[in-house]
A protein has these predicted regions:
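Short, well-structured secondary-structure segments
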Residues: 29-35, 66-70, 107-108
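Generic structural signal for helix capping and beta-alpha/helix-loop junctions
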Residues: 40-41, 77, 116, 154-155, ...
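Active-site beta-loop-alpha junctions enriched in small/polar residues
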Residues: 6-10, 34-36, 72-75, 112-114, ...
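Active-site acidic/histidine proton-transfer and metal-coordination neighborhood
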Residues: 59-62, 78-183, 193, 273
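Histidine-acidic metal/acid-base catalytic patches
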Residues: 1-4, 12-27, 61, 89, ...
Length: 285
């Protein structure tokens, strides 16, 4: 078990290479590479994306960092083709390949959300087809896909609704895909946001499918992505549930809500504190 942190918030401020230096300097052992929200001019978007990934891997090796999990872009829309003729599908495949170069064991790929006007279409059946289309790439690149619990925002009532939002739906989807290349990622905050206390969500999850986490804190009102203890979640309960599940994945933070407001000059201090929080959680697992 190691401590890792997503790279999105850091990349925006200082770029990938400096982000790696800051993460290593703060004491983290790993990164969760963020392939989402990449600007068009980013090297991962270009023709030489694999060369860029190899360069990052070399720098990570030199710094003593690893990448065990990554996050694919989530641009797929209902109706997009489930093959490389579609640019969004192709972006996921590219991310899978680059993540494998970085050393990732798994990459989070969001399920495709179904618009309300197409609500007669079964969400799980639609996404079984989507994920099965990605399965050959898992084998080609030697990487697993992690299915995450998600939400959609209902602005009419200013509330959130789960998308693959219960542990039962999440596990059923993975089982229906029918491949060992698919596992579960639980976003701690998403569980709370969609009405299930995270500790209860984890206890209802099939522990054999739980491979990774997005650890964040929030206030039950919005998807804040704060550092643990910066919101109102019950971390004693969450840690207890993870211990009882014999969770052996990483302490992986998705905390751009914590890092976004921090000036670049204060990132070393902020990351050092985050690494200390990670050590605190790890010791209790």
């Amino acid at each position: 078990m190691i401590r890792s942190v997503e790279t999105y918030a850091l990349r925006k401020k200082v770029g990938d290479e400096r982000a790696l230096e800051l993460v290593a300097g703060a004491g983290f052992e790993g990164i969760d590479y963020s392939f989402y929200w990449l600007p068009a001019e980013h090297p991962m978007q270009g023709a030489d994306y694999l060369s860029y990934a190899r360069d990052l891997r070399t720098k990570m090796d030199r710094l003593g960092l690893v990448c065990r999990q990554a996050h694919a872009p989530f641009d797929m829309k209902f109706g997009d083709a489930f093959d490389e003729s579609d640019e969004h599908f192709r972006g996921i495949v590219r991310a899978m390949e680059a993540a494998s170069v970085l050393g990732a064991r798994c990459i989070v790929v969001h399920a495709v959300k179904i618009p309300e006007e197409h609500g007669a279409i079964n969400l799980l059946s639609y996404n079984v087809e989507f994920y099965r289309a990605l399965s050959p790439y898992c084998r080609r690149f030697g990487i697993k896909i992690a299915v995450e619990n998600l939400f959609t925002t209902d602005r009419r009532c200013n509330c959130y609704r789960g998308v693959v939002g219960t542990p039962e739906e999440q596990c059923e989807l993975i089982r229906r895909i029918g491949s060992p290349d698919f596992v579960a990622c639980v976003d701690i905050g998403h569980a709370a946001l969609t009405g299930i206390e995270p500790s209860i969500f984890l206890r209802r999850m099939d522990a054999s499918l739980l491979a990774c986490l997005h650890i964040q804190d929030l206030d039950y009102a919005k998807d804040r992505h704060f550092l643990p203890f910066g919101g109102t979640l019950n971390w004693d309960g969450i840690l207890s549930a993870l211990r009882d599940a014999h969770y052996d994945g990483d302490v992986s933070f998705e905390i751009y809500g914590f890092l976004d407001p921090v000036p670049a000059e204060l990132l070393p201090a902020a990351l050092s504190y985050a690494a200390s929080v990670g050590a605190y959680l790890k010791e209790r697992l």
